Amino acid sequence: MPKSEIHPKWYPDAKVICNGEVVMTTGSTKPELHVDVWSGNHPFFTGTQKILDTEGRVDRFMKKYGMGSADSATSKETKESKKSDK
C-alpha cells in the first residue's frame, strides 16, 4: 500500500485541451493538460506535410566555407582520379 501523503493525486480522466477544445482524455497528475500540437492537427499525422526544397548539408558546408559547391568538388575529384589512372 503506497503512503498516502507522498504521492501526487492521480486523475484517471484528465482532459487534454488543444485550442480550447477537448481532444482526448488520459491519466495524469493534473486534471487538465493544455497542448499546442497533438496528432489531430500535426502536419505529419494529417498528411498536409509540406516538403521544403532546401540545400543539402554538404552544399551548405561547401558554400559556408568558400569551397564552391559540392558538385564542383566531386567533379574535380573525378577529373583528378581519371588523370592519375592514365
Swiss-Prot record:
It comes from the Bacteria. Binds the 23S rRNA. GO terms for biological process: translation. The gene is rpmE. This is Large ribosomal subunit protein bL31. Pfam families: Ribosomal_L31. Residues 74-86 have a biased composition (Basic and acidic residues). Keywords: Ribonucleoprotein, Ribosomal protein, RNA-binding, rRNA-binding. GO terms for cellular component: ribonucleoprotein complex; ribosome. Belongs to the bacterial ribosomal protein bL31 family. Type A subfamily. One of its GO terms (molecular function) is structural constituent of ribosome. It comes from Prochlorococcus marinus subsp. pastoris (strain CCMP1986 / NIES-2087 / MED4). Part of the 50S ribosomal subunit. Residues 65-86 are annotated as: Disordered. HAMAP family: Ribosomal_bL31_1.
